[in-house]
Amino acid sequence: MLHSNIYSLQTEATNKILSTSSLEELESLRLYYFGKSGVITACLRSISTINNIEERKSIGSAVNSICAELKSLMNSQKEKLHKIQIDAQLMEDKIDISLPVRPKQIAKLHPISKTLHEVKHIFVSLGFKLSDGPELEDEFHVFDALNTHKHHPAREENDTFYLKKLVNNKRIVLRTHTSSVQIRTMESNNGNYPIKIIAPGKVYRNDWDATHSPMFHQIEGLYIDKNINMGHLKYCINYFLKKFFGENIQIRFRNSYFPFTEPSAEVDIKCSQKNWMEILGCGMVHHNVLTNVNINPEQYSGFAFGIGIERIAMIKYNINDLRKFYSNKLQWLTHHGFCFTNLIT
């Protein structure tokens, strides 16, 4: 009786397994037949009640074979239903290839980085070499060696950032200009001429408004050799300004005063029909400065100049507030930034 029942149970289970249409339905069938209280599980338990050993072996072998076939069929049906489920989901989630892709955000070069690169490129084409120095400096390299006396307004604490702690009994400042690099270069020159350098870098002054920042970028230049005169300086400055702003730019030199140059000049460019704008300071290196770094002013002369990078960037790219350079606003940088392909190489 059990023998005939198990085969009819196989036929019934096979038909039900093949007719399932979902993984959930198939799992319910598995529990119905093979769970702890399942129909086939009960048949397996009842085998032990058969007294005839040969009959018990025959029925046990048949039940085990049927169990293996049904479980194999369930696994095959499970794979089939799983594939159908995935295909249906893919059809539901298909991508509309007619839709435009999201635009890629391309990195932009900051206007200050662009300006620094361009200025350095122009002066390197004139034979200047790049030179660098520390941003934390002692007073000698920032002021004393540059002929700036102890009572000069630039040395007051409301204009300059001083460190509270002395180093080797010297007051340390955040450099107010990269002229300190010029001093260090002349000190370590060891009689090798000409000295022809530009010193780009960050400088610090205690000021903050639409046209001033407590930290800004500067490039200073220095050219020391025999028989260097004001004509060399004017040619160099004119060449730079025409390359940077365009050949049609109008330039004028005005007498001025700086403690580290004599004669000194400020250079203006014409921004409209009536208005001139100061763009940089320059002059012939003062004899006292040369003497302070053990260069004989009777044999050697030279010129120096200083350019504020933010200032010329504001003029060239029509930016009216210096503070926007450091605002970190992505919208502003996207508008005023430059593609890397625009770099001069």
Curated annotation (Swiss-Prot):
Gene Ontology biological process: phenylalanyl-tRNA aminoacylation
Keywords of the record, alphabetical order, are: Aminoacyl-tRNA synthetase, ATP-binding, Cytoplasm, Ligase, Magnesium, Metal-binding, Nucleotide-binding, Protein biosynthesis
Where in or outside the cell it occurs: the entry states: Cytoplasm
**Which domain of life, per UniProt?**
Bacteria
Q: Which PROSITE patterns match?
A: AA_TRNA_LIGASE_II
| CDD domains xref list | PheRS_alpha_core
Cofactor binding note from Swiss-Prot or TrEMBL: Binds 2 magnesium ions per tetramer.
- Cofactor(s) of this protein: Mg(2+)
The question of whether Metal-binding is a record keyword is answered with yes
Report residues binding Mg(2+).
E262
Question: What interactions and quaternary structure are annotated?
Answer: Tetramer of two alpha and two beta subunits.
Q: Identify its protein family.
A: Belongs to the class-II aminoacyl-tRNA synthetase family. Phe-tRNA synthetase alpha subunit type 1 subfamily.
Name under which the protein is recorded = Phenylalanine--tRNA ligase alpha subunit
Q: Which organism is it from?
A: Ehrlichia canis (strain Jake)
